[in-house]
């Protein structure tokens, strides 16, 4: 094959000193070693696999070149080419080694003259394929060769890594053949027939120094932020490199790239493709040297990974574990004094990979690591809690009850369980009479009874828990059941029952016998009715025998104690007893149970009279009626007595009496009697009988009661039998205290007879369960209806002579069929039923809003910035719903384009448009009622009506006797102009301040002709009322917050400043109302 023509290199100038060349080359070496490249080369090591295999023809062509030019180094003259062939090869290899491994020697590529690179490439390929380099320094007598690599090189056999290096070298050599253009430089000097470098630095190559250079090159590659790898698929196959997950060949390729980029002079502006690219073969003596360097580096790092030996040439610093932190390198120091710490921060990631955990890690509890349950995944912070939680899954129950087989895992659950046995020791069991629920704990039954509170019932049974000396309210209603017994140290046993019957007449008008205790539901609306105690006796004896002493009144129910009909003297005696108890005086309240007939015998025999007596002499023996054991027939209707602590009752009386006194001063409440039927007892009962009252249900009594020791205060019980509300308790006790204080009675009577305001009717407020509306009834009729006022009650007390009038049972429960709420008045139920219908009779007079109840309408009116008086709402509703005769007199009406609202009243329409935003307030029109004429100017519609519809009977607002409804200013003139000399209208600055004060002389001027017939008619809306005071309050709706009117658009402002700002918008055309005066 013909030889390729070789170009002779230009001869370098001989006058340039070697020292200058060395200094320039030294400075370039500093720049290469320390700084990162800002002009990345286009050639990348990622393109190696593109030309992995060279074509056979190219390789044969390259191998067939002449040996004269096989070195790839042209000589200045042709006759010296053969003489320096071998020396040039050795010298070039040494220089290339210096350019790669020594910071003081730069690249060789820029120094070669532009010549053909084919012989050099073929020679390098042959060297790499051979896998070894034979250096024969004595062949040409050149013993002074600067290459001194013999002692430090130990060649390893070819490996997979060496093959990759060979492929990389071939790839880079081919790149050099295609795009490498050499430029003349002063890096080599021709001296004595051969090329000599301008630097005398020798290359002392060792594996340790090679490792340093490799790390420095990797550091430079990592610093190059502009380097972007476009093809991830062109990587080499995985190789376990000690540097990182990348292979060592990738590191070496990056090294060659950085060397080629640093070899450019600062003044050279060639693009990266035109710059010289140094092949791997020119950096080292052979591929074997590269292979050995990689092997030594891997061995060094692997040895360091296992253990840090002190004799390691370059131990990896701790900063290598954080390869992500990339900092710019410091300014480059001289290459001879380059410190190793500059390489520490920017080395490639070590193949150690995973950072080892610190050896001094704290225990789990000390470090705060949470504990997680492996079964349910619950995360717990403390180990003790975690162990306790694991008991749930393991099933270990270490706590066992000593009295039963009950076991639990937690101690607090065992303590709660032991309370069951405490009640069982006393023989107590609590059972619900409305369902099969049974509990040994009273509190559980009390909670259970809440599920029955929304259903009407005439009887319910709750076993009473004998509490500690605390007053607790709990429901106690029963037919038959277990009896609570409390065994005290003295052997005292308290036993009692209450008599009830299961007749179906208890929910109606009553039946024979003593009725059960009825529980009235408390509605959630309008101060609902509290619980009431109702007892019925249809067969009560007609005659009422007066007892000898007021202290002889005995009762079997706690309800009669707080009823409204006890006498003043009896209440006084009771309060005196309570006062004595508060003074630490011993008072024995021994309660005995009186006889009650059977339910079957109630129709044939008279029922005993209910009364109660406080017995200060407990030693006095009582008749045999209560002390004898009860017969089986009498046992079924026996009454369970319960004692009441005098101290607890007194404290509750004083507290609730004070609260009721405050309530009396705040608002007047009418009285209404309680639904309590009092049974009369024969006069044969001893006056010294001890009191016995209770509402507890229990079993039959089988033995007489024993008296408490003298001076011993019985344990405190619940004051009330049912779980009544605080309001009812306060009202009950207030009635008792009211009987004692006659001043309170007179104050209440006077307050009930008079009402100060004509606008507040009796039905406006929710009445108390003790109030009465039957003022006009006779005393007998009042008794039949179960409602008696306070004065009539006193009359009945005086007539009966005993303060215990007879009450007829009256069922006042009115349940709602829709939601189940129960009310005590039919009027309240009727008002409540309106919520379940679709009727909305409460309509807003300013907009189409309608509400079901009055409160919602009042709430809605706040949108219009109107402070409405509650009494005006009904009149407004009646005026809006009624069709006024003035509706046909308006010749035009206003229409809102936003929501379609239409009205004939200007003020009403302005109030409506104020609900919209500013942009929407101009979207309206004024329409003629007689034709289809539409305009936005009120002056135009008036002109239209005056010319087109003059013969119509309808009158315009300006022609009517009443003031114009289109302007508030005309209203102020008519309202304050005639006979009113005290009130005046103040107009300052054209702000039209409306101050309307209707006085007796001014009102006839509004509607002189129609006042006797229609009353007071509002000129702003269809409101009509009959009283002047109500009309005055209604005018405040329109005038209290809108006092300043715009004479252009009739919009109202609250302050003069706002009106001035608003008028400015009429001076500029806005597309809405024009600024016309009319």
UniProtKB/Swiss-Prot annotation:
Cross-link Glycyl lysine isopeptide (Lys-Gly) (interchain with G-Cter in SUMO2) placement: 175, 215, 225, 357, 369, 463, 472, 520, 546, 577, 584, 594, 636, 655, 670, 701, 707, 739, 775, 795, 867, 888, 955, 1011
Keyword set includes Ubl conjugation: yes
Major localisation: nucleus
One CC-aspect GO term: ribonucleoprotein complex
Organism the protein comes from: Mus musculus
Compartment list: Nucleus; Chromosome, Telomere
Protein name: Zinc finger protein 827
ZnF (C2H2-type) intervals: 371-393, 399-421, 430-452, 814-836, 842-864, 894-916, 926-949, 1016-1038, 1044-1066
Compositionally skewed regions (Polar residues) per UniProt: 33-42, 62-76
């Amino acid at each position: 094959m013909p030889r390729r023509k070789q170009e002779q290199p230009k001869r370098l100038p001989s006058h340039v000193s070697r020292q200058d060349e060395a200094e320039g080359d030294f400075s370039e070496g500093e720049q290469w070693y320390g700084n990162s490249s800002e002009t990345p080369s286009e050639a990348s090591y990622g393109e190696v696999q593109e030309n992995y295999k060279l074509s056979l023809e190219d390789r044969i062509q390259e191998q067939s070149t002449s040996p004269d030019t096989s070195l790839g180094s042209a000589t200045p003259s042709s006759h010296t080419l053969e003489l320096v062939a071998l020396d040039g090869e050795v010298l070039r290899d040494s220089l290339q080694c210096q350019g790669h491994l020594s910071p003081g020697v730069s690249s060789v590529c820029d120094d070669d003259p532009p010549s053909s690179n084919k012989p050099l490439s073929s020679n390098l390929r042959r060297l790499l394929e051979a896998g070894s380099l034979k250096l024969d320094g004595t062949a040409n007598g050149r013993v002074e060769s600067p290459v001194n690599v013999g002692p430090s090189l130990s060649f390893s056999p070819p490996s997979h890594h060496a093959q990759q290096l060979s492929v990389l070298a071939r790839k880079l050599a081919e790149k050099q053949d295609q795009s490498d253009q050499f430029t003349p430089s002063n890096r080599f000097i021709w001296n004595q027939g051969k090329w000599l470098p301008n630097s005398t630095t020798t290359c002392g190559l060792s594996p340790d120094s090679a490792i340093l250079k490799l790390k420095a090159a990797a550091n430079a590659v990592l610093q190059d932020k502009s380097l972007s790898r476009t093809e991830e698929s062109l990587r080499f196959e995985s190789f376990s490199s000690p540097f990182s997950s990348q292979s060592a060949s990738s590191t070496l390729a990056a090294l060659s790239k950085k060397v080629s980029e640093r070899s450019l002079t600062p003044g050279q502006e060639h693009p990266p493709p035109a710059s010289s690219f140094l092949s791997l073969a020119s950096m080292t003596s052979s591929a074997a040297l590269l292979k050995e360097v990689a092997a030594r580096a891997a061995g060094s790092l692997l040895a360091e990974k296992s253990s840090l030996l002190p004799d390691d040439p370059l131990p990896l610093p701790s900063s290598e574990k954080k390869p992500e932190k990339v900092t710019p390198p410091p300014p480059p120091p001289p290459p001879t004094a380059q410190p190793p710490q500059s390489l520490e921060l920017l080395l490639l990631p070590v193949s150690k990979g995973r950072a080892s955990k610190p050896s001094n890690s704290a225990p789990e509890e000390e470090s705060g690591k949470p504990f997680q349950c492996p079964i349910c995944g619950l995360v717990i912070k403390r180990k003790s809690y975690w162990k306790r939680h694991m008991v749930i899954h393991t099933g270990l129950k270490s706590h066992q009850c000593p009295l039963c087989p009950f076991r639990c895992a937690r101690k607090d659950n065992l303590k709660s369980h032991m309370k069951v046995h405490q009640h069982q020791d006393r023989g107590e069991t609590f059972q619900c009479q409305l369902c099969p629920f049974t509990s040994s704990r009273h509190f559980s039954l009390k909670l259970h009874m809440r599920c029955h509170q929304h259903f009407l019932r005439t009887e319910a049974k709750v076993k009473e828990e004998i509490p500690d000396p605390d007053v607790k309210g709990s429901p106690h209603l029963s037919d038959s059941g277990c009896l609570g017994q409390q065994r005290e140290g003295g052997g005292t046993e308290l036993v009692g029952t209450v008599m009830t019957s299961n007749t179906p007449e208890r929910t109606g008008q009553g039946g024979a016998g003593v009725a059960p205790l009825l529980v009235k539901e408390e509605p959630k609306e309008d101060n609902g009715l509290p619980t009431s105690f109702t007892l019925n006796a249809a067969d009560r004896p007609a005659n009422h025998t007066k007892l000898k002493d007021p202290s002889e009144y005995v009762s079997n129910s706690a309800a009669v104690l707080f009823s409204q009909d006890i006498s003043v003297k009896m209440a006084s005696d009771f309060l005196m007893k309570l006062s004595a108890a508060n003074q630490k005086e011993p008072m024995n309240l021994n309660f005995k149970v009186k006889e009650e007939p059977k339910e079957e015998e109630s129709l044939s025999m008279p029922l005993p009279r209910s009364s109660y007596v406080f017995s200060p002499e407990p030693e006095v023996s009582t008749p045999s009626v209560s002390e004898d054991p009860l017969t089986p027939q009498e046992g079924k209707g026996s009454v369970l007595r319960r004692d009441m602590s005098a101290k607890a009752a007194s404290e509750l009386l004083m507290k609730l009496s004070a609260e009721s006194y405050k309530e009396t001063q705040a608002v007047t409440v009418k009285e209404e009697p309680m639904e309590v039927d009092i049974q009369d007892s024969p006069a044969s009962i001893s006056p010294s009988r001890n009191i016995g009252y209770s509402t507890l249900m229990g079993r039959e009594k089988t033995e007489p009661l024993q008296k408490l020791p003298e001076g011993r205060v019985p344990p405190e019980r619940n004051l009330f039998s049912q779980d009544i509300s605080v309001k009812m308790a306060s009202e009950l006790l207030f009635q008792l205290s009211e009987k004692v204080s006659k001043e309170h009675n007179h104050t209440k009577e006077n307050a009930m007879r008079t009402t100060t305001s004509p606008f507040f009717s009796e039905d406006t407020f929710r009445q108390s369960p003790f109030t009465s509306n039957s003022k006009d009834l006779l005393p007998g009729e009042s008794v039949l209806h179960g409602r008696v006022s306070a004065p009539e009650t006193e009359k009945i007390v005086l007539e009966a002579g005993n303060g215990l009038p007879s009450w007829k049972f009256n069922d006042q429960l009115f349940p709602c069929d829709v939601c189940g709420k129960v009310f005590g008045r039919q009027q309240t139920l009727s008002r409540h039923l309106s919520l379940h219908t679709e009727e909305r009779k409460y309509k807003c007079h300013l907009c189409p809003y309608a509400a079901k109840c009055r409160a919602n309408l009042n709430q809605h009116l706040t949108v219009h910035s109107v402070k409405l008086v509650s009494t005006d709402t009904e009149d407004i509703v009646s005026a809006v719903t009624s069709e006024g005769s003035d509706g046909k007199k308006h010749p035009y009406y206003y229409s809102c384009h936003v929501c379609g609202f239409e009205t004939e009243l200007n003020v009403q329409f302005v109030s409506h448009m104020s609900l919209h935003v500013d942009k929407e307030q101009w979207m309206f029109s004024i329409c003629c009622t007689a034709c289809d004429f539409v305009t936005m100017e009120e002056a135009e519609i008036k002109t239209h009506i005056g010319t087109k519809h003059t013969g119509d009977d309808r009158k315009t607002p300006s022609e009517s006797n009443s003031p114009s409804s289109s302007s508030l200013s005309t209203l102020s003139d008519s309202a304050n102009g005639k006979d009113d000399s005290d009130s005046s209208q103040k107009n300052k600055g054209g702000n039209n301040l409306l101050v309307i004060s209707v006085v007796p002389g001014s009102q006839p001027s509004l509607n002189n002709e129609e006042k006797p017939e229609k009353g007071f008619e509002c000129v702003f809306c269809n409101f009509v009322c009959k009283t002047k005071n109500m009309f005055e309050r209604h005018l405040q709706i329109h005038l209290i917050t809108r006092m300043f009117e715009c004479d252009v658009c009739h919009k109202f402002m609250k302050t003069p400043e706002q009106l001035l700002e608003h008028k400015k918008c009429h001076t500029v055309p806005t597309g809405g109302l024009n600024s016309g005066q009319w």
